[in-house]
Regions:
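Membrane-embedded beta-strand positions of outer-membrane beta-barrel proteins
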Residues: 37-39, 83, 123, 166, ...
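Transmembrane beta-strands of outer-membrane beta-barrel pores
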Residues: 41-47, 76-78, 87-93, 125-133, ...
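Residue-level signature of outer-membrane beta-barrel architecture
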Residues: 70-74, 113, 125, 170, ...
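Repeated loop/turn-to-beta-strand initiation elements of outer-membrane beta-barrel proteins
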Residues: 78-81, 118-121, 175-178, 234-237, ...
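Outer-membrane beta-barrel "beta-signal"
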Residues: 289-301
Length: 301
């Protein structure tokens, strides 16, 4: 775990350095930095299909979702450096106790060097995980009273994903970009070995049964596409798609789509709709989908 902690600390330090650099170089802050932060709380309705791995057995109800997003982008000469941190956590009570609706830790740091008007050579580190335990409700063995118990299926950095990539970025405008990274490397971490594993002893592709906590993968190609645009006054659409093609199993490419629709009602109120679709055979050999609709407070600066 020491190595895992070092990797995470290194990645998060990139974001912290944004603020430090901005404070120490006031002229660059004014001229070259563009920063945006939003935070808030929404009351929401959430639902899942039966395949959603992080909270299997939870159908959905009314709950509360908290979020914090901050992004800093530096542009000077041919250098483009983007740091993006997204934190989300939501709970609901559907009559069977408190359950999660959403739980996400996302950090991305990408630095690029322009080689033409629309193309850059870039390097990137991406970290993704969650905050708390997730369960497959009612799927465990029966207790002394004959009631089915819940299976622990996820936790903080169980799984956790750290991806390093170097490649080409196509950035034709300010609202869309796409990266191409042959040879991207991904580490899957399972820090909690008490989570449930399959008949082969694997949890998220990691051999937990035999005491392993880390799996390394190399992609023949990783593609990431981002779209972020105000499609109407006070209405924003944000999309992120990621494809990771492990060279050892091209028939089982991992795909993830994140979509977020935000409509501001006034300065502090907004409506948000989140949609996530995941296909990753190391999690579950079916398409996972989740959606979250909420109305609540939004503060941006």
């Amino acid at each position: 775990m020491k190595k895992h902690s070092i990797l995470l600390a290194t990645a998060l330090s990139c974001l912290m350095s944004v603020g430090t650099f901005a404070q120490e170089t006031k002229k660059d802050t004014v001229s070259y930095w563009k920063k945006a932060t939003s935070m808030g709380a929404t009351f929401n309705q959430a639902s899942f299909n039966d395949s959603w791995a992080a909270t299997q057995g939870s159908k959905g109800s009314v709950g509360l979702n908290l979020f914090y997003n901050t992004k800093g982008e530096y542009n000077k000469d041919k250098v483009n450096w983007v740091n993006d941190l997204q934190l989300q956590y939501g709970l609901l009570d559907n009559g069977s106790g408190m359950r999660k609706t959403i739980d996400r830790i996302f950090f991305d740091s990408k630095i690029g060097h322009k080689i033409s008007k629309t193309w850059l050579v870039y390097g990137n580190v991406n970290v993704q995980s969650q905050f708390t335990k997730g369960y497959n409700y009612g799927a465990g063995a029966k207790d002394v009273n004959g009631n089915a118990t819940d299976l622990l299926v996820s936790n903080l950095f169980a799984p956790g994903y750290i991806t390093e990539s170097v490649g080409l970025e196509w950035k034709p405008n300010t609202v869309f970009n796409m990266t191409f990274a042959p040879g991207a490397v991904r580490q899957t971490i399972v820090a909690d070995k008490t989570i449930n594993y399959d008949a082969n002893g694997l949890a998220y592709g990691v051999d937990v049964k035999n005491g392993k906590s880390l799996r390394n993968e190399v992609a023949i190609l990783q593609i990431v596409a981002n779209y972020n645009k105000d499609i109407a006054k006070n209405v924003n659409l944000k999309l992120r798609y990621q494809l990771f093609a492990n060279y050892q199993d091209l028939a089982a490419m991992d795909s993830r789509l994140d979509a977020k629709f935000t409509a501001k009602i006034n300065k502090y109120l907004s409506t948000t709709f989140d949609f996530i679709a995941i296909y990753d055979q190391d999690q579950i050999a079916r398409l996972q989908t989740a959606q979250n609709l909420g109305v609540g407070l939004l503060y941006s600066f």
